[in-house]
Amino acid sequence: MASANRVKIGLKCAECNDINYTTTKNSKTTTEKLELKKYCPRLKKHTVHKEVKLK
C-alpha cells in the first residue's frame, strides 16, 4: 500500500503548547522530528512549532 509509511503528527507551538496543525510525514525518509516556523493564532505571531505524536 502506498501510504503505509506515512504517520499522522501534530505541530505544537513551543511558546503556548497548543497543537495548531496536523499533518503526515513519511517515517522512513524523515527520521528526525520536524521543527517549522508557523503562525500561532493564540499568540497572533509566527513561532516555532515542533512535532508531537497524535493519539
Swiss-Prot record:
One of its GO terms (cellular component) is cytoplasm. GO terms for biological process: translation. Keywords: Ribonucleoprotein, Ribosomal protein. It comes from the Bacteria. GO terms for molecular function: structural constituent of ribosome. InterPro entries: Ribosomal_bL33, Ribosomal_bL33_CS, Ribosomal_bL33_sf, Ribosomal_zn-bd. Belongs to the bacterial ribosomal protein bL33 family. This is Large ribosomal subunit protein bL33. It comes from Campylobacter fetus subsp. fetus (strain 82-40). The lineage of its organism: Bacteria, Pseudomonadati, Campylobacterota, Epsilonproteobacteria, Campylobacterales. The gene is rpmG.
